[in-house]
Amino acid sequence: MSRKSALESSASVLAQADVGASGIHPSVIADAMGDSASAEALERLNRAAQDTKNVDNAKHLARAIQAVQLQDYAKADKLALKLLEKDERLGLAWHILAIAREKTGDFASSLRAYEAALALLPDHGPVAGDLGRLAFRMNMPELAAKFFAHYRLARPDDVEGANNLACALRELNRESEAIEVLKAALGANPEAAVLWNTLGTVLCNIGDAAGSIVFFDESLRLAPDFSKAYHNRAFARLDLGEIEAALADCEAAMRSPGSPEDLAMMQFARATILLALGRVGEGWEAYESRFSPALSDAPRFQIPGVRWSGQDLRGKRLMITTEQGLGDEVMFANMLPDIVEALGPDGFLSLAVERRLAPLFERTFPKVEVTAHRTIAYEGRVFRAAPYIENWDRFDYWAAIGDFLPSLRPTAEAFPKRNAFLQPDPARVAHWKAQLEKLGPGPKVGLLWKSLKLNAERARQFSPFHLWEPVLHTPGVVFVNLQYGDCEEEIAFAKEELGVEIWQPEGIDLKADLDDVAALCAAVDLVIGFSNATINLAGAVGTPIFMLTGASSWTRLGTEYYPWYPSVRCFVTEQYGVWEPTMGRVATALRDFAAS
């Protein structure tokens, strides 16, 4: 990217809404079936074109369809537009234009063209199916479900229609409806491997990993080379703590991927599995797959210049952008003291972070130029820039902060034992300590029980709140709410059903005021919770933590501890969905902590 382009991109980015930091997570693969440009779909279009009464239109439609068949999407686009200039109500031309633009990645324009075709064509079914797949790909499951339901009205016995509707319902956390759709479809099509696979993913969503494996096994019995089923069985085995078996399944899946995006997701999943096994060097090498262009959630960095690739940094001028989700930005900052040291006294560092983190990083690293990055979503893709940087010529290199993991953290043992690496505002720490003292005697324990971005697939990684009862009944403890987002229901449940008051700190937005959140974390005696943005802040400022984590959590790097934060004590659940033993162990440890 040129520097001129970077400035133009910065202006464009500033004009659009910042969608914020968001990490890439390995997930099940059971997506919408079908292809708008498949041989069957194009044959159907050809038949419709032949039925067109206007001979000249029929001839040009046939040429446009042939261009799609030859994957000459630019030509198909041009021919469709010419037809629409003559007759803007020609539904087949809109359909061809939609397909051409979908295939070139112009999703927003494609969506509009599909909608025009849907309004004009008498046979709505195929267009509704194409629209549903595009909406699903653009992470619009509610819209996708409507179009897939429309498609099924036209083709009620179609395997593709049942599968696609079930996938959309799963993404909407409507698992029981998805199961009913799949059960009916399997009754009529018991040999359809894709339906067994999708049923397995629905069970994964609700935390039944063991049950899901039965369905993935059946899918693979019917279709031994079905890569999605291998990948998804790997995912289920991770939930059960079977990491070696998960790696074998993941590598089997990579031998015959169904699409470039499937392969990219499998490669990223393999990277995290290697890390979970403690094969850290191999894992970081494979972790580069997080930026694969084939991953729709992977950011496209709008940053000019040379990306750093291991060169000596002594005396160099470096620009770094943080990456992944908010918690990852904090976690990877574990390396910043080492990077500053590598640059030396004559070097210079400019650091782009999520804007809410800027005050905390400025205080901790006063010699570093801290700026805000900005992330936008456009036509189904994610773009990240540092729009407030104007002079790019001063930098020798730029890097994503994760680029330093292979060299600075090649093993779990390479992590420093420093208790804290971010510095909260001492005045605000004192303020919160004074507020906490007013609550009476006993240790002040911060609680975190969920993530803000919590679809059903991620929800299985968190214990239901009612299972916190043995922890909340620990005598002599004052509980402090650190949970951001809507948590009134859980706090009311604790008070009304369990008789436990969880103190709500006043004058702080637990989602937006992250500098003050870091100070509050530093003021409490202990934090208990799952890995989310706030618990990473607590670890970064050195607060003792009881962290609840899954058996295959890759961030433990194959250890029984948490290399990123020495203050963390891990409580590992052997299987998602079976939290009671883990919560019991946390309750016992908290009683011991309160008594000490």
Swiss-Prot record:
Keywords: Bacterial flagellum biogenesis, Repeat, TPR repeat. InterPro entries: TPR-like_helical_dom_sf (IPR011990), TPR_rpt (IPR019734), Ycf3 (IPR050498). One of its GO terms (biological process) is bacterial-type flagellum organization. PROSITE patterns: TPR (PS50005), TPR_REGION (PS50293). Pfam families: TPR_19, TPR_8. This is Protein FlbA. TPR repeats lie at residues 91-124, 159-192, 193-226, 228-260.
